[in-house]
Amino acid sequence: MAAPQFHRPSTITADNVRALGMRGLVLATNNAQFIMDNSYPHPHGTQGAVREFLRGQAAALTDLGVTHANNTFAPQPMFAGDAAAEWLRPSFGLKRTYSPFVVRDPKTPSTP
């Protein structure tokens, strides 16, 4: 499987993009030529090439997530019902991410 050449749309397939992995995909995209070579059109047009690229990118992200699934935090409940500071927080929204205190830069004057 050859690496996709982004200036030649006919070389872009989901499998080729997926085979690069996320690191290789970022490097290949950054090193891509800006000039489009119209003598190598994609069979489904430019939109088809874009669709294949996005499918390959999604598959590469999925592979990355599966590979590192054991290296991430366990999912947490969305609402912190048993939190010690529950009484300080409003009874709606994402309590786990809501800070009960307003943090301000001490150098900034407060507004009246």
Swiss-Prot record:
Chief site of localization: virion
Localization per Swiss-Prot or TrEMBL: Virion; Host nucleus
NAD among keywords: no
Pfam families per the UniProt record, alphabetical: Herpes_UL35
InterPro entries to which the protein is assigned, alphabetical: Herpes_UL35
Domain of life: Viruses
GO cellular component, one term: host cell nucleus
Keywords (A to Z) from UniProt: Capsid protein, Host nucleus, Virion
Listed GO biological process terms: viral process
Secretion signal, residue range per the UniProt entry: none
Role according to the record: Participates in the assembly of the infectious particles by decorating the outer surface of the capsid shell and thus forming a layer between the capsid and the tegument. Complexes composed of the major capsid protein and small capsomere-interacting protein/SCP assemble together in the host cytoplasm and are translocated to the nucleus, where they accumulate and participate in capsid assembly.
Family affiliation: Belongs to the herpesviridae small capsomere-interacting protein family.
Subunit description: Interacts with the major capsid protein/MCP.
Record-given protein name: Small capsomere-interacting protein
Organism per entry: Human herpesvirus 2 (strain HG52)
